[in-house]
């Protein structure tokens, strides 16, 4: 392989993950500004995901990671969520992401239904991949599974769709 080709391949990865980290950091900032009585924990940039068993010791799946946990003023968990920057790739990435989200939502809601906490699941997604009509349709179907407990937003939708009343509703 010519040096130029190798350099081009390596250059593509120099900022790998940066857009996702920027998105996560901005979400944390917006959340803190919009909901000063609530708290949000998790890695704002690079860092280990939060395993749900560390929040809920009786959570049945020891390998269920989340990107953040939102807590009310008393410290009780009220929401968990995921932040993803979707590139412009569709295909397998698209199917894996949304299919995994559906399974995850079902698992978390099933667990929480027995405990009656009213836990919400928030999916923060952004990036040009959302322009793929099928990807956005899949996200809309995900939210439609239980709009009282599931929310899919972009940063532009944050102020319009993510409300404290919804977060705190049991």
In which residue ranges do the predicted regions lie?
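Short, well-structured beta-strand/strand-turn elements
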Residues: 34-44
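Catalytic core segments in nucleotide and nucleic-acid processing enzymes
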Residues: 43-170
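Interdomain/boundary linker segments immediately adjacent to catalytic/signaling cores
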Residues: 1-36
